[in-house]
């Protein structure tokens, strides 16, 4: 602790550059261990010094300061401490505002590391409401962040801003975040949808799919998802589609974007993301109206071919089970189901455990 506290004097804005750089390099190394993070977070002066150096005129010093914040916010407990310490110190450090400003600044060379800091902070669900309060104070903050995400060449310093996807995903953990994402005022969801199939980066793609999952798990938005515009449903289905040919009759059922896909069409390579997409579809199967729309849009036909591929190529048991769960519902007639809303059904705990075990044994038999 004493060694750490001695570094603070060398991390002041008016200190010699070489001393700042060496001291900060040492601090950055300390943030790589739990003990080092604990020592730093126990000293308000040290955290204040790190905050201050994020604005340093020297790019390397400023970058190392932000990288230190990334490490300090890497787990939920430490992220919560950093967030509250930033408010408590004098003068307070507006960490969310600074991050949002840097990310939306086209000329910021530190937009990427700042996006990782904000991603870490928004991952803590207990902080999300307060972070949303801050982001909404500026009328243009959320629209600018959405623009920065949607426009791949937005940052002129070659920052890729992929971590905006998990930021938006984290914000949709809560109902208010989902409302903002789906609100016509911001058109956030519309801007994010194309990146559910973005092959170049799994962080951007995974964050976008996470947003879709969070929205699908909220029945309030099922009407929006399955409205006249097929964009959201297409974003969910496209990564599950392959190059298989359908009959003309089956093709006519599919959304136009999913008809006659080329032979080069590939499926999502990450099994965790495939499972999330299938979980989206399962949530959409909750009501009779939604099930009827999914059947009419050819979702069963798409999953029929997907299931063959997963059993032969993908070979992921969780994905096979997730697919089976959706197919089992869509293949039935509504008269057989006899329910308007599956979510109104209460399943006893012992029966639920039995279903889980049966599912495990069934999927195992498919892959053995």
From Swiss-Prot:
InterPro entries: ARM-like, ARM-type_fold, Hgh1, Protein_HGH1_C, Protein_HGH1_N. SUPFAM superfamilies: ARM repeat (SSF48371). Pfam families: DUF383, DUF384. Belongs to the HGH1 family. This is Protein HGH1 homolog.
